[in-house]
């Protein structure tokens, strides 16, 4: 055999191995699909909880005689509970595991729905809502992290975006059935996805990256093998995880203050900045009190909620498709641009209405503005910050970073949700003008700071950001 023939055989062998690795990376197994479905049952719970306060407002106020301030507390206290959950989310997810954390969260979610369903006064309403908020605070961190850690890199964005899709499904479901079901029965319906996740969690594998971090190499490989398929060659991916964990183990243990080192600054600024933009754009307040916005704009809230329910799921599906085709960065820019435009439209609509101008058109403008804003949010800004958060932090600081980023999200979400009704009473047009300005600033921030992470391994993304300022 000649040297040239040996060379060709070697090249053919290397090409065959590369193609086999590519096939393994591209494979989407039934285990990955089922594991993702089980985890996003928690996202569905989140969506149901977020939509509940809007459709239940009239019934609860009439039955229990709550004031606007009392109901604002009930509506917003879920975000305060989420803030508490966020403080513990990273540590709990590392100590109990991703699966254990989801199971633990559902205990509080189930208690919360039962407390709301049986409440006789505002105190039990608030306790139940606070408990549900604590649960979704834990879930909002652990679900995208778990999905990012189990999925192949080429579909990671789409699978993590299923988190936002299922939130939209839960929100849409409650927007629809809330018009026909008593608020107590609606709370009991919220128990169904909680129970479904509790049962199905027993049948999915733990995150292989977390098992690797714990030093359970055998269990890590077994989990990875089940996720990639029995006949898949997982050696390269398993070795990458092992090498990364060894590198992190050799360094000092992570503390919150470590996040303020120069090497982690880009990741922290991007993660926290996107969460602040998501909340300060007014998205949470609008979804919690969308009925009030429709009524104030002269559009029937029951019809508006139904329109939203029909539109939100296709828009979230569109985002799931586009996240791997367009990439994270372009989709974020398009989504924030849409939110910016529709905030301005709502500002003009309420301004015209306050001066008695275009009385026949302002309700239509309000409907278009609300539906357009929430649709734009669902396509990108609703889910992408969580995707990027799950990608940009190395395992050695993921606990501290995840806690900080999730805490920032829920803290500002609580402020916006609590103040939203009061801001609308103060000046509806001015309120949406403020949100327009924030969305405009967000476009500049995304363009200047947020990198594209599509199609890259977690280790590659994290290394590039860590070395950015070195």
Swiss-Prot record:
Molecular function (Gene Ontology), one example: monosaccharide transmembrane transporter activity
InterPro entries (UniProt xref): MFS_dom, MFS_ERD6/Tret1-like, MFS_sugar_transport-like, MFS_trans_sf, MFS_Trehalose_Transporter, Sugar/inositol_transpt, Sugar_transporter_CS
Gene disruption: observed consequences: No effect on the root lengths compared to those of wild-type plant under high salinity conditions.
TM ranges: 28-48, 68-88, 99-119, 130-150, 157-177, 186-206, 268-288, 303-323, 332-352, 368-388, 404-424, 430-450
Any one GO CC term of the record: plant-type vacuole membrane
Organism superkingdom: Eukaryota
Pfam families recorded: Sugar_tr
Name assigned to this protein: Sugar transporter ESL1
Origin species: Arabidopsis thaliana (Mouse-ear cress)
